Amino acid sequence: MKIKFLFILAFGLLAVLSAASQTVAYSLNDTPLFTVRMPDGWMFESRPNPRNPASKRISGTASKGLVWFGVWVVKDVKTVDEAYKYVQTTAKTLITDAKETKAPYNGEVNGMKAKYSEHTGTMKMQDGKSQVFDAQVVLFETGSGRVGIAVCMADTEGLKVEKANIEAFFKSIKPIK
């Protein structure tokens, strides 16, 4: 009886865990580079990157609050430090008052060399209204001579209600070996 109960309990937990998120693989030129787990309720799509149509960008929105996220490969860079220059340039292009809120620091994500940074600024929305965003950026060396970027931009409310999912999103980035 106990074994049957434990089996049902374990099966139920597995069903809940598998329904709670979806792992997505990022590939470039048909070569898988890394995976990232999208939390339950986050809507996402894969499309050509507007700044580099030869690569794709997986992006979307969270289910609660104003939260946008994206992952892609930074064009023509081989290190996180080179990619960081790209972040600074791109941030100033999209968000004219962009500023760092926390000094960038080096670390790792699941065995990959990484650089973390946090920013804030005002961005025009599609409806023309201005919106203040906080952005978290993780640059990571995929081990294939490419650097991936994961970005999450959110308003204050989005940061509060999606905090755990945002943290899980960044921690889930893994190389494909």
List the model feature ranges, each with a label.
Residues 7-16:
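Bacterial N-terminal signal peptides
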Residues 34, 38, 82-90, 162-169:
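Stable alpha-helical elements in mature extracytoplasmic
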Residues 35-85:
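Secretory pathway targeting signatures of secreted, lumenal, and periplasmic proteins
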Residues 74-76, 90, 152-158:
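Short, solvent-exposed aromatic-acidic interface loops
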Residues 1-7:
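Bacterial N-terminal signal peptides that target proteins for export
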Residues 88-141:
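Signature of long, low-cysteine stretches enriched in small and polar/charged residues
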Residues 20-22:
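Boundary of Sec targeting at the N-terminus
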Residues 42, 145-177:
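Surface-exposed amphipathic alpha-helical segments
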